[in-house]
């Protein structure tokens, strides 16, 4: 922590010391004009700058500034002192680089904590000041920058800060369990009154002393004997003593929402959504704060008009007519109504009224299908959605360590002209399972699409998001997007169906997809994004329960997702939603697992309960894993996050191992020129994280291979080909061999093995490292590359077959401790043995990187039979002194009977 003393204070101190010594002469800075004793000096050049910071609660000791120059490290700085505006901190130009006054300085105001402790930012945005666009004060030679808490604007002039109510919130005292209303002001008041729906219930002129916890000129803490009515509005008015002005504020309930008393009163563990039978449908929605809910039932999911990119678009066949039904508020804040008729195929919405929204129409968060663009939920009879033979479809219970996961986007598999399937089915669920497609070039024909995946041999496909996204689903206007913009979690995305207007079609076609893959021995894992929504404002969650479902930092949405908001899995009703949602999706669509985006934003308790529910109530072998990190700073306490550092707390789920990825190729956030063990050819690379990954990440991510997913590439960042090329490798043969070497280690490691679709033939996105909304062409699987790189494809086939069929990669954590990984003197060669006790084979694995080593790269393969040589050397003879070339993998086996 750096503390810079006030420049003004230093100057004044110098003058004071001079006076004490009897020396009355002083010298002014060279850039100040000489004046008489009665004139103020005037600065002709600036000497520094001052940040001024105002908080209505005057809590300056709890905050500091993080400041950095462009391209340099930052530091924490405490505020020097306070004045009539607030806290301030002053710097001399001498504290910074010589040219700073001609440039800019970056800053964050945050809680006075280390970054490792997840300090809350005053505003989420990183801000900066460009001095050349400002004027300095000629009175003191300083640029003055004025900041206000909660306001991201950077001001160049002093802002008005008047009398304010600085706190108006209900909370719970966790020692006494009392519910209290806490009111604070920044100036003395003569009167405070609280009105509930217009009726005065508290006045400082007539207080019930038995309920007063504290009463001063600037603060009132008042006890409530029971839970306040959270559907009412509590208006606080404060009359300020000095001016007589009256300020008002609405009391917030947000601090109650995580309390035991709130959960006792409002947590609901029953069914929610449209509960359908042919005789009647009951609608249930949780909204304790609302004063009115109206159910609207439509004949169609298509409105007369939709808004796309700010423009109104008319839809053929659209209809805005609906039947209206008033809902009744019951226990736990659940609103319900029952319609005694068969509503299958109808669509519905809720119109919600509370203190934040008036008759705003939303889709039920529990809706299970929808019409075009997810604007109206659908009432579904799921018995009408099952394809022939659906009852015979069952998730194949593979051991999770035998999983070979193939990550693919619905559109990518079929968007290339080289797919050669039915043109109308390209980019759709139907195209994803269309059989008998191929591509021919010259005299060579290769399988494409679904047949390509079957030929490759993977046993699991992980689909990029297929839930309903905030996209325009019209087939004639659809554009590519990864899909990390959630709209309706329990609804399938309509743009992948042949008819996005009919909520039944997407369900039927996706079930056909699952069935086709199941018949091919391939399970489906769904990528889920519960950590944020596309837009918090007017989202169905926020409309139903403002300030409950999301995390906040100083009144603004916390942005740990990097997408503008983050959901609060630690709030019991959102935890319930995640658990209910995954159970529905896994059960109805016969999914084998889930991949959680930015899982670090979810608390471990939620993930543990979710995993237990799926294992107990859906499938004991269901696979659950996620990204064990966040996308930014979150307000969720670090020891609660489902991140790598808390892996020992995970129960029934695992996470990606980015450590083996970075050790091999320096992926993720590394500079593109950084090199790993695979791509570094000129110096020795570390092997620690590689060895850890091979044995289930025992020493780094914990000692349980059932909790690790080993990989080198995924949809994020570069493809493997592009990543190697970005590191400066230009020779095509070298790139090919490096790519195969990287995934050879992945597919022969303990734990789940994961790959990005297309790596089996060196897929490229033309160097695009973030193709989330790039063109279909950038993201397509180009099957001409399969012909070009058939040797790569063949190597992947063998690696995948070995992973799945040899009894080598389902070791317990105790067994993994006994695996011995060997390497040569400089680590350019790694080799080890595994025993298949069931089939009585000993396998030997050897991997050589591209470092031109002077150390031995000899491995004893005497008596072994070759299974795989990734370089396909025609003259290779296994012996007691087999020499591996650079970038070569040799796998061989022998009988141990």
Model-derived regions, located:
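Carbohydrate-binding surface patches
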Residues: 275-291, 818-860
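Short proline/glycine-enriched turn/loop motifs at strand-loop junctions of beta-rich domains
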Residues: 57-61, 183-190, 286-292, 861
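C-terminal beta-strand-rich structural cap/linker in extracellular carbohydrate-active enzymes
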Residues: 345-346, 877-897
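Bacterial signal peptide processing site
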Residues: 21-23
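Substrate-binding/active-site clefts of carbohydrate-active enzymes
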Residues: 396, 409-589, 602-619, 623
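C-terminal motif of bacterial Sec signal peptides marking the signal peptidase cleavage site
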Residues: 16-19
């Amino acid at each position: 922590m750096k503390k810079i003393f006030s420049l003004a204070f230093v100057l004044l101190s110098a003058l004071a010391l001079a006076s004490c010594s009897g020396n009355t002469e002083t010298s002014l800075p060279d850039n100040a004009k000489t004046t008489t004793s009665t004139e103020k000096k005037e600065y002709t050049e600036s000497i520094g700058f001052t940040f001024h910071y105002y908080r209505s609660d005057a809590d300056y000791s709890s905050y500091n500034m993080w400041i950095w120059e462009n391209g340099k490290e930052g530091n924490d700085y405490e505020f020097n002192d306070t004045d009539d505006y607030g806290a301030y901190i002053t710097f001399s130009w001498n504290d910074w680089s010589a040219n700073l006054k001609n440039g800019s300085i970056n800053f964050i105001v945050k809680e006075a904590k280390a970054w490792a402790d997840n300090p809350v930012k005053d505003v989420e945005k990183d801000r900066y000041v460009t001095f050349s666009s400002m004027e300095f004060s000629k009175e003191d030679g300083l640029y003055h920058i004025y900041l206000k808490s909660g306001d991201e604007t950077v001001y160049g002039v002093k802002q008005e800060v008047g009398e304010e109510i600085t706190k108006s919130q209900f909370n719970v005292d966790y020692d006494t369990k009392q519910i209290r209303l806490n009111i604070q002001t920044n100036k003395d008041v003569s009167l405070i009154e609280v009105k509930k729906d217009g009726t005065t219930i508290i006045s400082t002129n007539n207080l019930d002393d038995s309920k007063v916890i504290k009463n001063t000129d600037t603060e009132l803490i008042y006890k409530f004997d029971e839970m306040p009515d959270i559907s009412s509005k509590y208006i606080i008015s404060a009359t300020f003593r000095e001016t007589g002005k009256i300020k008002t504020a609405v009391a917030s309930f947000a601090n109650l929402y995580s309390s035991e008393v709130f959960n006792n009163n409002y947590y609901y563990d029953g069914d929610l959504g449209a509960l359908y039978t042919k005789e009647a449908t009951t609608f249930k929605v949780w909204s304790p704060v609302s004063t009115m809910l109206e159910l609207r039932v439509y004949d169609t999911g298509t409105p007369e008009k939709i808004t796309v990119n700010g423009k109104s678009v008319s839809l053929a066949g659209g209809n805005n007519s609906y039947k209206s039904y008033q809902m009744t508020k019951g226990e736990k804040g659940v609103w319900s109504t029952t319609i005694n008729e068969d509503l299958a195929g109808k669509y519905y919405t809720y119109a919600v009224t509370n203190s934040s929204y008036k008759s705003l129409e939303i889709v039920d968060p529990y809706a299970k299908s929808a019409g075009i663009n997810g604007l109206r939920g659908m009432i579904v009879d799921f018995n009408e959605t099952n394809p022939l033979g659906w009852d015979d479809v069952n998730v194949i219970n593979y051991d999770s360590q035998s999983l070979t996961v193939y990550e693919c986007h619905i559109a990518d598999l079929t968007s290339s002209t080289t797919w050669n399937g039915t043109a109308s089915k390209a980019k759709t669920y139907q195209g994803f399972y269309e059989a008998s497609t191929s591509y021919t070039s010259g005299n060579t024909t290769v399988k494409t699409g679904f047949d390509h995946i079957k030929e490759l041999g993977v046993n699991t496909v992980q689909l990029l998001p297929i839930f309903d996204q905030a996209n325009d689903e019209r087939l004639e206007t659809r554009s590519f997007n990864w899909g990390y913009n959630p709209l309706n979690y329990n609804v399938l995305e309509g743009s992948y169906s042949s008819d996005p207007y009919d909520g039944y079609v997407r369900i039927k076609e996706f079930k056909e997809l699952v069935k086709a893959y199941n018949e091919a021995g391939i399970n489906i894992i769904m990528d889920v994004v519960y950590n944020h929504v596309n837009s918090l404002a007017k989202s169905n969650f926020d409309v139903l329960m403002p300030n409950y479902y999301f995390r906040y930092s100083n009144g603004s949405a916390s942005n740990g997702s990097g997408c503008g908001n983050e959901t609060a899995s630690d709030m019991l009703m959102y935890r319930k939603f995640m658990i209910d949602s995954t159970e529905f999706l896994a059960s109805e669509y016969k999914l084998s697992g889930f991949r959680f985006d930015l899982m670090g934003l979810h608390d471990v308790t939620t993930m543990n309960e979710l995993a237990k529910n799926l294992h107990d109530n859906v499938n004991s072998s269901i696979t659950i894993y996620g990204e064990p990190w966040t996308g930014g700073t979150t307000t969720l306490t670090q020891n609660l996050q489902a991140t790598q550092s808390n892996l020992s707390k995970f129960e029934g789920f695992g996470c990606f191992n980015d450590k083996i990825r970075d050790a091999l190729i320096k992926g993720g956030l590394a500079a593109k020129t950084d090199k790993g063990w695979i791509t570094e050819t000129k110096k020795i690379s570390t092997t620690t994280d590689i060895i850890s990954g091979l044995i289930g990440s025992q020493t780094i991510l914990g000692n349980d291979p059932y909790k690790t997913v080993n990989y080198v590439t995924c949809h994020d960042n570069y493809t493997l080909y592009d990543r190697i090329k970005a590191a400066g490798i230009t020779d095509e043969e070298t790139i090919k061999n490096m790519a195969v070497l990287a995934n050879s280690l992945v597919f022969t490691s303990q734990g789940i093995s994961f790959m990005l679709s297309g790596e089996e033939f060196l897929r490229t996105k033309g160097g695009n490292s973030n193709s989330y909304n790039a063109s279909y062409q950038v993201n397509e699987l180009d099957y001409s590359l399969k012909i070009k790189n058939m040797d790569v494809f063949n190597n992947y086939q063998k690696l995948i077959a070995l992973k799945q069929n040899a009894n080598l990669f389902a070791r317990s954590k105790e067994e993994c401790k006994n695996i011995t990984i060997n390497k040569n003197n400089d680590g350019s060669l790694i080799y080890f043995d595994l025993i298949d006790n069931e089939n009585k084979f000993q396998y030997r694995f050897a991997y050589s990187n591209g470092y031109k080593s002077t150390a031995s790269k000899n491995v004893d393969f005497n008596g072994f039979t070759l299974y795989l040589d990734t370089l396909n050397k025609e003259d290779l003879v296994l012996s007691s002194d087999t020499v591996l070339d650079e970038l070569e993998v040799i796998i061989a086996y022998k009988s141990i009977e």
